[in-house]
Amino acid sequence: MDAKMGYIFKVMRWIFCFVACGITFGCTNSGFQNANSRPCILSMNRMIHDCVERVVGNRLATAVLIKGSLDPHAYEMVKGDKDKIAGSAVIFCNGLGLEHTLSLRKHLENNPNSVKLGERLIARGAFVPLEEDGICDPHIWMDLSIWKEAVIEITEVLIEKFPEWSAEFKANSEELVCEMSILDSWAKQCLSTIPENLRYLVSGHNAFSYFTRRYLATPEEVASGAWRSRCISPEGLSPEAQISVRDIMAVVDYINEHDVSVVFPEDTLNQDALKKIVSSLKKSHLVRLAQKPLYSDNVDDNYFSTFKHNVCLITEELGGVALECQR
């Protein structure tokens, strides 16, 4: 009898531990839940996630789907992603074709909880979208004057979903937008110290058009469209595309035409194309790779510090002065 009772107690102890773990770490069918059973807000990437965190504070749980150095252009869902999407109260996507793989589209399109920030911004005329060969450029986080508008969209969605915390979300959002405005002005000041004849950006792939239009071009160039001559890359909007000899030669000609002395590799991209370009120019033109890589489709520590990194690196490598940032 004692042995039987001991067995029963042992089984009950295991059941208790299992249930406790489920409460603490589980994801129920009705949504992500943590120890406090807070609804979860899922962001597709860190550029969105870092803004969402600032807006919600500690009122809601937050999570990010595409982490680390993974390429958002080519991301295919892995085990557990389906549950994360199904269990989230709101899913913030960049939109504009960034989340275009079949597995992501299957679970995001027609999902009532999915919010495409880029499309919402275009619908209310918040910015002028850029295109390449008829494809919309999704890299809007590169321009803080656009991305702070995304914060406003995020806030409006969250207030509609959770009106009980509207005052707190609005206050957090206003503080963040103010900080982003200061950071935007700082970036313009830094990059304006680069001599105008040196403001030419050669990067790994075409992720810096919004950045160039906002921070490297003159007002006259923005108005006329001539700002496009301020940047080039061997790869297109997505790093998935194959690079041709013609693409490489176009960059070589650009470097010679504008007397470019430094080209910028990107953290997540293979540097072979840029190395070939530098190598092919060795005898006729002195050009080198920047000492550090730029971040385009991912972040280093967080979105805001990564933006500062890119601004400082481009400014200093192109002959400008990186001013002290107050934020």
Swiss-Prot record:
Entry's family note: Belongs to the bacterial solute-binding protein 9 family.
SUBUNIT field: Monomer.
Extent of the signal sequence: 1-20
PANTHER family, per the entry: HIGH-AFFINITY ZINC UPTAKE SYSTEM PROTEIN ZNUA-RELATED, METAL-BINDING PROTEIN HI_0362-RELATED
Protein species of origin: Chlamydia pneumoniae
SUPFAM superfamilies in the record: Helical backbone' metal receptor (SSF53807)
Name of the molecule in the record: Metal-binding protein YtgA
One GO term of the biological process aspect: cell adhesion
GO cellular component, one term: periplasmic space
Keyword entries, A-Z: Iron, Metal-binding, Periplasm, Signal, Transport
Any Pfam family the entry gives: ZnuA
